[in-house]
């Protein structure tokens, strides 16, 4: 029984230390502005995809207009 208590206490201690280290690392990432960089990358990618989608949509509309009016 005593060895089981020691094992559980050791497991609890190691889990607490691990959690503490994760929180410190997360705090360091927030201080460095890591999230801002990720948001900026997402914004750039999103803008590029929107631009490409608009270009493709405009081209499809132009072709559809051409075929519907028989002015090709």
UniProtKB/Swiss-Prot annotation:
Keywords: Amphibian defense peptide, Antibiotic, Antimicrobial, Cleavage on pair of basic residues, Disulfide bond, Secreted, Signal. The keyword Aminoacyl-tRNA synthetase does not apply. Residues 1-22 form the signal peptide. Its main location: secreted. The keyword Secreted applies. GO terms for cellular component: extracellular region. Antimicrobial peptide. Active against the Gram-positive bacteria S.aureus FDA209P (MIC=16.5 ug/ml) and B.subtilis ATCC 6633 (MIC>64 ug/ml), and the Gram-negative bacteria E.coli O111 (MIC=8.2 ug/ml) and E.coli ATCC 25922 (MIC=8.2 ug/ml). Not active against the fungus C.albicans. This is Brevinin-2GHb. It comes from Sylvirana guentheri. The gene is br2GHb.
């Amino acid at each position: 029984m005593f060895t089981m208590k020691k094992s559980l206490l050791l497991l609890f201690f190691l889990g607490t230390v691990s959690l503490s280290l994760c929180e410190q690392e997360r705090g360091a990432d927030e201080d460095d502005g890591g999230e801002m960089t990720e948001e900026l990358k997402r914004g750039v990618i999103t803008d590029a995809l929107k631009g490409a989608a608009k270009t493709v949509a405009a081209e499809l509309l132009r072709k559809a207009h051409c075929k519907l009016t028989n002015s090709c």
